[in-house]
Amino acid sequence: MLNRGGRWWPYEYAWQGDQVRSKYGKLINLYLEKAATTRNSMTGEWLKGYPAYVPVADSLGRPIEHAGATLHLITSRTILHTKSRTISNYWLTAIQPENVIEIHPSDAARLGLRDNQRAWILSATNPEASWDLGNGIRLPIVGRVMTREGIRPGVVNFVLGYGHFAYGALDVVIDGQLVPRDPRRAAGVHANAVMRLDDYLRNTGLSDVVGGSAVFYDTKVVLVPA
C-alpha cells in the first residue's frame, strides 16, 4: 500500500451528486471579523477579512524589486537534521556531510553550471553573497550545485541545518584559551542572509504583516559560478 502512495477511493465514489461525499463537518470561516477590524500598523489601512491574493511587498505595501534576479529561492528540511541543532551529530553528518544548492537541469544548462560545481548566491539586498557576522568576520554564501529533476525550473532550494558559524564551526577564545573549530560543523551553505530585506526597515527580512512571520519563499536570486 505504501509503495502505491496510499489507499484510494475510485474517483466516482468521491461524489454524491454535485457535492463531495466526505464533507468537512466543522465551521470554516471564510470571513474573519477580527482581521477585518484590524488596521495594518505600518500603513493604517484595514486588513482584509477574507481570502485574497496579496503580491509580495515591503512593510509599507510597496512592490518588491529584485534587481534582475530571476531564480526563486526556497528552503526545505532534510529528514536527517533539525533546523540547526544536530550538526554536532557525526553519525548524521557521516551520511550527508553537507547540503547543496538544488536547481533544475534546464536552469543549470542555461547558467553554465554543472553538478558539484560551486556557485555564489546573490540577491538585490546581498549582492556580495556574504554573511556579515558583525564581529569583523564575513562568511561567503557559496555552495555546491546539484541538479534535480524533482525541483521546478526557476527555483533554487537549500535544505536547512548546514552552513553554521557557531556550534563550534568557528574558532572561539574562552578565558584566553583557543577552542579550535571543527570544519564538519561549518560544511554546506546557509542562504538566509541572502533573503530579501524590507526596503523600508532595512535591518530585517520581509514579513507577513497579518501573521507576523518571516517570508522565506519570496526572494529572487542569481547564481554565479565560483
Ranges and model annotations:
Residues 1-4, 13, 17-24, 30, ...:
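Long, contiguous, secondary-structure-rich segments that constitute the structural scaffold
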